[in-house]
């Protein structure tokens, strides 16, 4: 039966190719001119016959350039093995979810249906061209989505270094002519280690989720501590075994061994501790409210987090070959790398970031205190820095305290100055000068010292947001699991280690010299011999070769991106 079906498909394909050549002959003749005119007319229209909404001007211009390379003839039917090439493309669309993409965005079912119809009929020239150009349009969209992402990063307030422009016209044309569409798609994937690891994790989590008829749910009668007993320990162990399995196709055991020791101890406690550490919780193995919420989070939610994180990684250019620094806001962590091989980090430390929605009770301040997402280059360090206080903090927080306590400024090493120069002379806190602080004619800064909010050092990468990395006297806050306490700048847990990393190419800067500079009497500025790229990023899922870590969506960016992707997909609906 299979041989008969295959033979029939081959006959249909041969019939289709002969029919295509009859309708669209090559060479300078009337038939060829008719094909050219029909193609040009189709590509000059505002919308494509297969899609409800108009395509963009950029898409139309790209398609026009693509078909001009082929003298406005059929592209996909002009190769040696068109059937295999078209099937390869449709299979690529079917597998789009494994890339964190949506198959319907590329009209997968519509094209698959039309492909069957074409092979079982005598299509018109218009039908051939509509199908051919639909393949090209969706391939362009797929490659663009895979390489650059579906939503512009600036639309989501991600201000990142733009990626290098890609000549999609020549690449698509070459891929079709050489029948290598799959290879081109592979080449368009981000090469970032983080992306590839998330892609692997996505496959695993999809496999796990497919096994469940309903989400896994645990309902312990009380807080479960190591050594406690519960009938759900076996179920918990099976679930965590599947999550921690190195296999890409792990199985969730549902038939719990009645002989299992239902005492919460041993390896299952270790796995819970690892889970807590991955989610920035205290890794004590105690299953309380927060840990229970983690365990009961549907796998579909984790899949969405992975997909959204992959989307954001598509926005990033290739990482620099030399050292670079990454801050992931939801993870409250900083990593410093010697090279662009992300799996080999040189430093890994806690950070404190700008306040989240939950931390901001005032609706108007919800976004103003968040740490922005952008990239830059650390170019110099400031030891024993002054803190030049932003006007918003001055008027909203400090001056109201001064009005209640006239000694507040002096007790906190705060001084009024005409400008922020190191040589500026402090002015008295007279009523007249206080009024000039309100009107921005004078400024307030904090002197270097143990009370200084920036600690003993700050790491400067000039930007439009006045954001930098810095030390802090408030080291107790690093013991918290959720560390969103700043006004936007990023406080680092181990500033001396980060300084040693940053000054690696500056001759003579040893640990001892850094310590001396941090505790000297006067401020000093040190320019880096080699600027270090820094990326302030936002990803609620990160994967390594051993496990996936998920983080809370503290700024609600996942929700915003998910909405933008859904709205964008509505604009790509096929008839």
Where are these regions (language model features)?
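N-terminal signal peptide c-region/cleavage motif recognized by signal peptidases
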Residues: 25-27
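Cationic-aromatic interfacial patches
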Residues: 31-164
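Well-ordered beta-sheet/strand-loop patches within structured domains
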Residues: 29-61, 160, 182, 186-575
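Intrinsically disordered low-complexity regions specifically enriched for long asparagine
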Residues: 15-17, 143, 298, 303
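Histidine-centered catalytic/metal-binding microenvironments
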Residues: 140-204
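Bacterial N-terminal signal peptides that target proteins for export
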Residues: 4-17
